[in-house]
């Protein structure tokens, strides 16, 4: 190098440490070649001694530093020190006489470069130029060095991700210990009721044991002791990830738990004192109980993010690739379970809000109901076309047409009309004097509605039409497959019985041949449905019904709605059988002069029975159901393969039952005590929130199969994931589950 006019010293060590060079006279390639990295590179070589002996920095002709070129250590993530002032000491300048020492940058052996510092003559310095392209024969060597740096950075980043996972897991286990062993234990010792403790902390003890006794120890052993020989995470996570589904129960209960904490803090001084005394401790970090309760809700999505980052850095041919991908799939499933539970809780909260707005006029707080859309709308008067303010609530099974109430608190709307989605029609209309109008037509009445804009009208029409179509698709699940259930009830029915359907929800079974009550074979099974009740006129004479002089009746054979004049009466075993004229003339109800010696033939039931689900199911079959434990009804129950976490129940039309769908992950199962004295065989109880149902099977074995399948779904799992999973069932003939 030149100083003032002058002499030169070997620039290698200075360049390697990022010291100022001599300006235009130094070569960038020479600096890279002089970088003392590698296992044999040390500060005791001749070039280093020469540099250490000269404590002054080279300057240009002006006496100032000619440059401060910074040499980054490329992909290793470590930058060399930038330019420093004269006399600054670096680690490799201390103890030079002590012989070989570790490298300054601690580089991997694969990154080792030539440790010999080349001697650069003044002529070579004068001929070199910083802006020149590097020598062609040195270019492959530089490419090899960059490739080595890139290969080294991958394993290091994987190790950093693993260490981050371990660190966050240790912190998380401490939070779980705080919730389980401090808050929960102290509140229990203080005498807080057990049901309150369970409502607040749910299954936090199980989550704590899983992480503290299984996941954390395995991660710690692998990352701190075995990583050099077995750098893998996928095998551990794949083995333990299925247990993360237990978070579903905690997440579903979270909002209720937070509400309990707030309520008991306000109403119980003892509860408040215990919680506040713990929150003041250093282990709480000045955070509230609710804040710590939130951590399990957020933990599973964090696993998913870390594992995605790990897979992104993992080479395609790595031995851990398949295990890591499978682990991500399982963890994503657990995260989806948690998210689904959150969405169900949010939907239920919305239903409860609407229930309060309606003042409890309609019992809509049912897990099968789903609020799809609500909004203000105007109804055009049928008399003079005057617009009137109204409010619509669109659910998956009905529309509530409401009138606003002028109240600041409490009930906001009164239900004027309830319209079932089944049989509903929506139609766009164009009127010359009124814009943005459409008509909703139900079984009992039609509503002409108006929106503020054309876009709002189109949105309402599209959403209502989509809801109608979806309801039709769901109703087809319960179409005419009554042979499986009705034959099990009545063996006299032929397996080849033709099945027809007059509606997507309620099938009608027709028979050919055979004998019926008193020598009569019904042509159809009768049913008393809501649709029949809503019919306005007699099918025979056409006169309009009213509640006083023209009442509705049903034919006991074909089920049509008729008036009293159009029916005939015949005594039969001290009972009356009302039939229409057509059925009476074709096939009389009873012989006009029955023989007292003739044995009475068993009368075939004219009521429809629940029908089977044609879709493949994990478990399906006939059950008995009761909401009170006293009155029982026959139902067809099915857990479909397409959605194994819901229970479909289809009841007989004589019970006025509509299809019900019960979300199983939010339900609780129990077997009633013998003291309850439920006289219906093998019974168990299914409970959701404040609603409960009693279900009864025909045998203990069948009861056990239902309990196992329902329990699996209630835990947020699926039958396919559990050992000994049930085989899918397709109802055919009279097969029972």
UniProtKB/Swiss-Prot annotation:
Pfam families: FYVE, PH, RhoGEF. GO terms for molecular function: guanyl-nucleotide exchange factor activity; zinc ion binding. Residues 126-136 have a biased composition (Acidic residues). InterPro entries: DBL_dom_sf, DH_dom, FGD1-4_PH2, FYVE_RhoGEF_PH, PH-like_dom_sf, PH_domain, Znf_FYVE, Znf_FYVE-rel. GO terms for cellular component: cytoplasm; cytoskeleton. Residues 521-533 have a biased composition (Basic and acidic residues). Residues 1-151, 487-533, 589-620, 713-737 are annotated as: Disordered. Keywords: Cytoplasm, Cytoskeleton, Guanine-nucleotide releasing factor, Metal-binding, Phosphoprotein, Repeat, Zinc, Zinc-finger. Coiled coil: none annotated. Zn(2+) 2 binds at residues 555, 558, 580, 583. Zn(2+) 1 binds at residues 538, 541, 563, 566. It comes from the Eukaryota. Residues 500-512 have a biased composition (Low complexity). A zinc finger (FYVE-type) spans 532-588. The keyword Iron does not apply. It is found in: Cytoplasm; Cytoplasm, Cytoskeleton. One of its GO terms (biological process) is cytoskeleton organization. PROSITE patterns: DH_2, PH_DOMAIN, ZF_FYVE. The modification Phosphoserine is found at residue 128. The keyword ATP-binding does not apply. Residues 370-469, 616-715 form the PH domain. Residues 157-341 form the DH domain. CDD domains: FYVE_FGD3 (cd15740), PH1_FGD3 (cd13387), PH2_FGD1-4 (cd13236), RhoGEF (cd00160). Promotes the formation of filopodia. May activate CDC42, a member of the Ras-like family of Rho- and Rac proteins, by exchanging bound GDP for free GTP. Plays a role in regulating the actin cytoskeleton and cell shape. This is FYVE, RhoGEF and PH domain-containing protein 3. The lineage of its organism: Eukaryota, Metazoa, Chordata, Craniata, Vertebrata.
